[in-house]
Amino acid sequence: MAKKTKKTEEITKKFGDERRKALDDALKNIEKDFGKGAVMRLGERAEQKVQVMSSGSLALDIALGAGGYPKGRIIEIYGPESSGKTTVALHAVAQTQKEGGIAAFIDAEHALDPAYAAALGVNIDELLLSQPDSGEQGLEIAGKLIDSGAVDLVVVDSVAALVPRAEIDGDIGDSHVGLQARMMSQAMRKLSASINKTKTIAIFINQLREKVGIMFGNPETTPGGRALKFYASVRLDVRGNTQIKGTGDKKDQNVGKETKIKVVKNKVAPPFKEAFVEIMYGEGISQTGELVKIASDIGIIQKAGAWFSYNGEKIGQGSENAKKYLADHPEIFAEIDHKVRVHYGLIELDEDDVVEDTQVEDTSDELILDLDSTIEIEE
């Protein structure tokens, strides 16, 4: 019985060696035919962690889980009219340029306001803009920009406005069933590999439609078929909530609105998280407002009554004054923003953070030693 077992093990080992050799030969042939990296073991990849770029909103970065939009992935932003979809996308454009990248905007709706984009921090002199005549043209332009590998972000506004050429050439009233869905499906198949290879972020803004005859369930749907839903790594549902009233002379005016951004799909972090941001009319997302709220919630900014303080120093009475203080002191804003991101694990600890942690630990050890010596003296 023992001999039979030993013989079986030898056969298994020999068979395993033959399979391993056959696999190595196959990998060499594939690499020869298709290039290095065509097939590799997952653990051999140099970059296993998903690279991200900040969305331009701290609250949204936290909701996304990874700290921003994943590079080399497709993002869909949809919601009702005037909910803030384009504003969210323009903040991503501004953040890309801030980090030294190049952004392109495919304006299929022909409705981009340069003055508003500039107010959000977009460098309109450096922004690549295209206003295509048809859906195919817009997607072809996006594809060529992505294939170049020189563009970091491409925004398409919007999928619903990508009208197929056949529909433009036809008459109003002609039936074009499934034409836009087929166009988007083909585009996703062609663009997805190139987007991943060049590490370009592709943001598709989409509108909402309602299904006819739906009695139960959610009747809302997005145009352009299902391809974009499948290929998107992140889908954001943007909804405007309550209006924000002004202060002082503008106390009777609506100066902005609270907006809820829900991550309904996320392939790089847990989904279904929500971010609440203040979109101020003519200014975009209030970055100081969200920082004051988030930092005070986790104790980085201390709140006592109506007063806000940081590191023992008062920074304002009421949230509006605290926002103004942070806007006037960008170095304090950056310091608090960094601490919040470290708290939520969006960025790794730097040397300064490690030094601070070490000092805290040393202080606690000294306190324990003092207590022990006190006990010995009393005894």
Swiss-Prot record:
GO terms for biological process: DNA recombination; DNA repair; SOS response. GO terms for cellular component: cytosol. Its main location: cytoplasm. It is found in: Cytoplasm. ATP binds at G79, P80, E81, S82, S83, G84, K85, T86. SUPFAM superfamilies: P-loop containing nucleoside triphosphate hydrolases, RecA protein, C-terminal domain. It comes from the Bacteria. Can catalyze the hydrolysis of ATP in the presence of single-stranded DNA, the ATP-dependent uptake of single-stranded DNA by duplex DNA, and the ATP-dependent hybridization of homologous single-stranded DNAs. It interacts with LexA causing its activation and leading to its autocatalytic cleavage. Pfam families: RecA, RecA_C. This is Protein RecA. Belongs to the RecA family. Keywords: ATP-binding, Cytoplasm, DNA damage, DNA recombination, DNA repair, DNA-binding, Nucleotide-binding, SOS response. Signal peptide: none annotated. One of its GO terms (molecular function) is single-stranded DNA binding.
